[in-house]
């Protein structure tokens, strides 16, 4: 089953910074590990006892990720232009 970005909008509503997102684009590979992210992937930052994946949003954005999920508890800055959903 192919999931497109538009399907995510049905689940979570419109993303923040949606101007650069193709709604008909298939969802790329989903990763929680910033060390393995490639262009076109979708990033879900995990929060652990020793790290916070949100700290790597700038890094994965510079690689060219398709979008990300961001915790509503995250107090830092999300890169300008990064399509993301706050959950």
Explain the meaning of each model-derived region:
Residues 1-87:
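N-terminal leader/targeting and accessory segments in enzymes
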